[in-house]
């Protein structure tokens, strides 16, 4: 069974399950409540407390355990409960700037583990990960709207995530990995700036859900003064990000500029209000990367079958 997973620093995403925070609590004894997964004699519970940012996600087992959660959710969504181990093919991705150096190690992180046994919701699972396809983020998201990009001589993809903002230049629909990088300008930096400013000026402790509500125009229950601070900080954040891209000699006022990722959805109003991008285009599906991984894996498999 092919399962596509986006291992974000803020959230883990799959195609058929709601995103969940990239955070775990490990315990030697069974905790009360929560989403608890049992693996190798330990209990793992999902938490809203994110794993601290790490450039290399293979440093410990936490992202593998998050992968087991994602696999179980996808098997459950497909009502896939066969006898014996389920053979799983994973489609995953990395930021374009890290792809060349890390893609082999990231794929091997999931392989050669044999049959992996675990339980979730008291249901036992046995999976055998027998193949992993690893692809560049941003490009994967662009694949989902490929028909609109393949005729463009130049398009810039900007993927605003939790800890990083990744960019990749496309030429006639093909990714140019010589023009890509990951900037530490993800929305978590914005959250921290907003929390500090609101605490200093209004003596209030905002959480990220309240910040999201303000930026998305929903009822946050906060005073107007707080909402103004949030929106002003968000506009400054977007301005700084776009200026950083311009300093890297990336043209934002000609050609297509495609924004993707949860951060782009969150900051759409500020991006559209900026005079630094002539005509931004948004991929609003926050699961665009994970869907792109699946498409790229399937295309790669067809290519192998046809001898390419």
At which residue positions do the language-model features occur?
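Ser/Thr-glycine-rich phosphate-binding loops at phosphate-binding pockets of nucleotides
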Residues: 160-166
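A contiguous pocket-lining binding segment that forms or flanks enzyme active sites
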Residues: 197
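Short, basic interhelical loop/turn and adjoining N-cap
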Residues: 202-205
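PRPP/pyrophosphate-binding module of the type I phosphoribosyltransferase fold
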Residues: 167-172
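Nucleotide/phosphate-binding catalytic cleft detector across ATP-hydrolyzing
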Residues: 1-155, 174-189, 209-308
């Amino acid at each position: 069974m092919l399962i596509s997973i986006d291992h974000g620093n803020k959230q883990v995403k799959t195609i058929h399950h709601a995103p969940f925070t990239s955070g775990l609590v490990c315990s030697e004894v069974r905790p009360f409540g929560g989403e608890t997964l049992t693996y190798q004699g330990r209990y793992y519970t999902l938490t809203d407390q994110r794993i601290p940012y790490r450039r290399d996600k293979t440093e410990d087992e936490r992202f593998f355990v998050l992968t087991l959660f994602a696999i179980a959710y996808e098997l459950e969504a497909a009502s896939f409960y066969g006898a014996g181990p389920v053979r799983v093919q994973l489609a995953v991705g990395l930021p374009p700037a890290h792809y060349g150096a890390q893609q082999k190690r990231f794929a091997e992180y999931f392989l050669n583990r044999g049959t992996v046994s675990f339980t979730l919701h008291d249901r036992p699972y046995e999976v055998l990960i027998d193949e992993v396809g690893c692809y560049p983020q941003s490009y994967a998201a662009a694949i989902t709207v490929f028909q609109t990009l393949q005729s463009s001589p130049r398009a810039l993809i900007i993927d605003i995530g939790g800890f990083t903002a990744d960019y990749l230049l496309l030429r006639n629909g093909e990714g140019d990995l010589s023009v890509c990088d990951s900037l530490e300008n993800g929305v978590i930096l914005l959250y921290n700036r907003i929390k500090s400013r609101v605490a200093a000026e209004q003596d209030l402790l905002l959480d990220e859900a309240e910040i999201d509500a303000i930026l998305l125009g929903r009822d946050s229950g906060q005073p107007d003064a707080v909402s103004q601070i949030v929106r002003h900080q968000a506009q400054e954040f977007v301005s700084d990000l776009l200026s950083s891209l311009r300093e890297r000699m990336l043209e934002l006022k000609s050609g297509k500029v495609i924004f993707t990722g949860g951060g782009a959805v969150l900051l759409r109003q500020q991006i559209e209000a900026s005079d630094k991008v002539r005509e931004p285009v948004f991929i609003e599906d926050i699961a665009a990367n994970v869907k792109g991984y699946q498409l790229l894996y399937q295309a790669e498999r067809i290519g192998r079958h046809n001898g390419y």
